[in-house]
């Protein structure tokens, strides 16, 4: 076998592989003999038909099979001998097999880039420092109360935080428009659901009041026909309600799985959940900064095949997330939606992979155990979850991969320029939610 390697462009390589005629002819004869033994030919006993007839009837089939086998086997040998790492499946272009002649084919594919991660000392990380304070806990308890709040009619002017029920008809230049009419519409004032100025016009009104709301749709409004248009809404306020928060009673506490109904137990459980969420958010913040710095310090070419594969993965995840379409009903989401995210994933994967290989990072058993225990605390029976992971090798391997990634992040962090900054609980959590 002879192999020549050509760099066509960027990461693309073209192998021209030549297989000696003797090897090809022997493979064709073997294939024809096998076909002769298994195929029925009229007038001849199995395996007794003349070679000329076998070639005439099965020659094309034998050549096709031999070509496939030669391309697969010799391509693998060629990339091993030339130390190439394909980033995707090759495009094969074979010449026709001719008796007594060498068989030649080309294989075109992309390789992974060759690089060494550098510039770790230039990465800057602002490490947020935060704790769950008593006021944070109180706010979270209030949030739980609001989630279980009820509404009661009041004979009062509508104000921030109140809920109103109203009818309205919208018009532009005296003409009603689609989507501008509603009856029995519920709106919590101050929630920011409506376009600017709409809620402000309701403030101070009482049930039974009829009035006109005059607003202008934003220039970036989602409906093209309404962008920047001035509109009037003929409105009537049907009902004004105020929010009634439940007291921290035994009954209320039991709604959250605290069988004793003890308020302090609820607070302790909520604080524990908040601390777990905060720890994860702090970790994510640091990790995101480390990866951003790693990418900025190391500009590398990306194999198009690897990016395309990542786009397909993201597309399938999106379809599952938004309804799990069956069969041919799935919409073809454009690749552009996922291009940037796919490129980042591939780039980060290559860079982290180099850090892991160069530093020979292996999963630390203590780190693996810590990750499993941390995940288990989110479940009702942590011990059962831990045992499940310990008995499931596939799940364990997934955790080991997480541990290796964490250890790589820690190594980069140890070389980076790190400063600390005290931040509030809400700020950390809100940033984490926005990033997700």
Curated annotation (Swiss-Prot):
Q: Which domain of life is it from?
A: Bacteria
State which Enzyme Commission number(s) the record gives: 5.2.1.8
From the Swiss-Prot or TrEMBL record, what is one GO molecular function term? peptidyl-prolyl cis-trans isomerase activity
Top EC class, one word? isomerase
Entry comment, domain topic? Consists of 3 domains; the N-terminus binds the ribosome, the middle domain has PPIase activity, while the C-terminus has intrinsic chaperone activity on its own.
What PANTHER family does this protein's entry cite? TRIGGER FACTOR CHAPERONE AND PEPTIDYL-PROLYL CIS/TRANS ISOMERASE, TRIGGER FACTOR-LIKE PROTEIN TIG, CHLOROPLASTIC
Q: What is this protein called?
A: Trigger factor
Identify the species of origin. Answer: Aeromonas salmonicida (strain A449)
């Amino acid at each position: 076998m002879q192999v020549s390697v050509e760099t066509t462009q960027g990461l693309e390589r073209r192998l021209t592989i030549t297989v000696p005629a003797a090897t090809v002819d022997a493979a064709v004869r073997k294939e024809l003999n096998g076909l002769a033994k298994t195929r029925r030919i009229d007038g001849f006993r199995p395996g007794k038909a003349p070679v000329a007839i076998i070639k005439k009837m099965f020659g094309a089939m034998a050549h096709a099979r031999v070509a496939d086998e030669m391309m697969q086997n010799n391509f693998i040998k060629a990339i091993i001998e030339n130390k190439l790492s394909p980033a995707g499946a090759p495009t094969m272009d074979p010449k026709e097999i001719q008796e007594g002649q060498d068989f030649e084919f080309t294989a075109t594919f992309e390789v992974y880039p060759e690089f060494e991660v550098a510039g770790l000392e230039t990465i800057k990380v602002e490490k947020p420092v935060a704790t769950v304070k008593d006021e944070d806990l109180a706010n979270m308890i209030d949030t739980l109360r609001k989630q279980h709040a009820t509404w009661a009619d009041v004979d009062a002017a509508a104000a921030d935080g109140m809920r109103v029920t109203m009818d309205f008809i919208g018009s532009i230049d005296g003409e009603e428009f689609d989507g501008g009419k509603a009856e029995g519409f519920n709106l919590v004032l101050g929630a920011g659901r409506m376009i600017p100025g709409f809620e402000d016009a309701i403030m101070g009104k009482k049930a039974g009041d009829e009035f006109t709301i005059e607003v202008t749709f934003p220039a970036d409004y989602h409906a093209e026909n309404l962008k920047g248009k001035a509109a009037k809404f003929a409105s009537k306020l049907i009902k004004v309600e105020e929010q009634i928060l439940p007291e921290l009673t035994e009954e209320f506490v039991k709604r959250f799985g605290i069988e004793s109904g003890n308020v302090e137990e609820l607070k302790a459980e909520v604080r524990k959940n908040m601390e777990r969420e905060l720890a994860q958010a702090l970790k994510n913040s640091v990790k995101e900064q480390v990866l951003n710095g790693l990418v900025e310090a190391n500009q590398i070419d990306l194999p198009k095949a690897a990016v395309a594969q990542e786009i397909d993965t993201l597309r399938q995840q999106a379809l599952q997330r938004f309804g799990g379409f069956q069969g041919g009903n799935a919409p073809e989401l454009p690749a552009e939606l996922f291009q940037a995210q796919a490129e980042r994933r591939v780039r980060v994967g290559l860079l982290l992979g180099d850090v892991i290989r160069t530093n020979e990072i292996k999963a630390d058993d203590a780190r693996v155990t810590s990750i499993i225990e941390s995940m288990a605390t989110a479940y009702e029976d942590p011990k059962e979850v831990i045992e499940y992971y310990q008995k499931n090798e596939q799940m364990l391997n997934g955790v080991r991969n997480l541990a290796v990634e964490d250890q790589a992040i820690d190594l980069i962090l140890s070389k980076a320029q790190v400063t600390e900054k005290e931040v509030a609980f809400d700020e950390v959590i809100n940033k984490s939610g926005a990033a997700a």
